[in-house]
From Swiss-Prot:
Protein name: NADH-ubiquinone oxidoreductase chain 4L
Protein localization: Mitochondrion inner membrane
Membrane topology: Multi-pass membrane protein
Gene: MT-ND4L
Organism the protein comes from: Avahi unicolor
Domain of life (superkingdom): Eukaryota
Length: 98
């Protein structure tokens, strides 16, 4: 395994660990999810280029489209929660609260 793949997998693992540790704040979770998506994009691009898979050249672009949609929905949710409650705690997203 080349060192670049190990570094990207380490970046993904770090972002995933950050998601598990900082799961109480919505902004921290969104940043960690973006880090995971970025490392997945770079890893998929490198794998496709190294294996010369001409059929799958569109997959990293599709991953970026989904990452942009996830970021837009996450930021809209963050603005909604911040305006409603004044905080960005994930526990405020519980729909069963009275």
């Amino acid at each position: 395994m080349p060192p670049i793949f190990a570094n990207i997998i380490l970046a993904f693992a770090t972002a995933f660990l950050g998601t598990l540790i900082f799961r109480s704040h919505l902004m921290s979770s969104l940043l960690c999810l973006e880090g995971m998506m970025l490392s997945m994009f770079i890893l998929s691009t490198l794998i496709i280029l190294n294996m010369h898979l001409t059929v799958s050249f569109m997959m990293p672009i599709l991953l970026l489209v989904f990452a942009a949609c996830e970021a837009a929905i996450g930021l809209a949710l963050l603005v909604m929660v911040s305006n409603t409650y004044g905080l960005d705690y994930i526990k405020n997203l519980n729909l069963l609260q009275c």
